[in-house]
């Protein structure tokens, strides 16, 4: 008798995706982040659902409802901080996942990569609208500053901003629609993630060497299920440590002050995972130029498959490209640090240099290194 998991229409899909999936035998722990992102997404949807049961998306009660969740709801404080720090874990996994893709040339699976970029944008949008919901000072001013960037669009800018606000400033209408977006987007992300997996399973996984491994594959279960469980346990352990010992480590103290349109915080800054893009935005003294640089800092990922000049897919055997890759990581860390600093000397010039280097590395230096490495190998 044939096993039910191979015949039942639903079980067959799960079987082909998580059990009998042929997988390269040499993929490292850098390939764990995909499953960890799935875990983060499930966790965020569940904690978010329980928070939504007690939260009220109204300017007069939003801040109080969050305080009520933390004080009066059973384990409400735990759910709230799991959700807030879960977002940070989500972005750590996301950036590691993208970094892995860049290093090992996974972007050569173009459909998978492009849907991945869409996923990144959707997660960033979700995190942004979610940060507005507690209606603290940083929520309000963050929403005001970022939505205001759209006014830089010629001709339709101002109308567009007022349309998004639902009025002439960030107010009740804005909060209500942001709550609606924050609720619906994770389900759109789930659907996109399923399509992301669908395209990945059309080609099979890449591996550290970048060489096709079709002739040497192993089943996903038990080898990689056990490996993913280990990764999941480490993720949960880290998240619990963060949530139970230092829940406010990554947050902003200003968000414990209720939103006040009449008082601007000394330093308006987003959550840590947006600081690199915020630094690029601030490094250009022109509003429209800054907005375009901000957009391009993320959308540049779409062009990466077109910028592949090397005849080798992975960076595993390419020392020049490796050096530039780690320079890019250091540059992104520098931008993240600059994004959290006030706009004054020497931070301004450091931010401008780091922004120039970011685009220079991706668009010029890395493709050039690929060509040089081809020459050195006489290819």
Swiss-Prot record:
SUPFAM superfamilies: a domain/subunit of cytochrome bc1 complex (Ubiquinol-cytochrome c reductase) (SSF81648), Transmembrane di-heme cytochromes (SSF81342). Its cofactor is heme b. Heme 1 (or BL or b562) is low-potential and absorbs at about 562 nm, and heme 2 (or BH or b566) is high-potential and absorbs at about 566 nm. Binds 2 heme b groups non-covalently. The cytochrome bc1 complex contains 11 subunits: 3 respiratory subunits (MT-CYB, CYC1 and UQCRFS1), 2 core proteins (UQCRC1 and UQCRC2) and 6 low-molecular weight proteins (UQCRH/QCR6, UQCRB/QCR7, UQCRQ/QCR8, UQCR10/QCR9, UQCR11/QCR10 and a cleavage product of UQCRFS1). This cytochrome bc1 complex then forms a dimer. One of its GO terms (molecular function) is metal ion binding. The chain crosses the membrane at residues 33-53, 77-98, 113-133, 178-198, 226-246, 288-308, 320-340, 347-367. Keywords: Electron transport, Heme, Iron, Membrane, Metal-binding, Mitochondrion, Mitochondrion inner membrane, Respiratory chain, Transmembrane, Transmembrane helix, Transport, Ubiquinone. A ubiquinone binds at residue 201. Heme b b562 binds at residues 83, 182. It is found in: Mitochondrion inner membrane. Coiled coil: none annotated. Belongs to the cytochrome b family. Heme b b566 binds at residues 97, 196. InterPro entries: Cyt_b/b6_C, Cyt_b/b6_C_sf, Cyt_b/b6_N, Cytb/b6-like_sf, Cytochrome_b, Cytochrome_b_C_euk/bac, Cytochrome_b_N_euk/bac, Di-haem_cyt_TM. This is Cytochrome b. One of its GO terms (biological process) is mitochondrial electron transport, ubiquinol to cytochrome c. Component of the ubiquinol-cytochrome c reductase complex (complex III or cytochrome b-c1 complex) that is part of the mitochondrial respiratory chain. The b-c1 complex mediates electron transfer from ubiquinol to cytochrome c. Contributes to the generation of a proton gradient across the mitochondrial membrane that is then used for ATP synthesis.
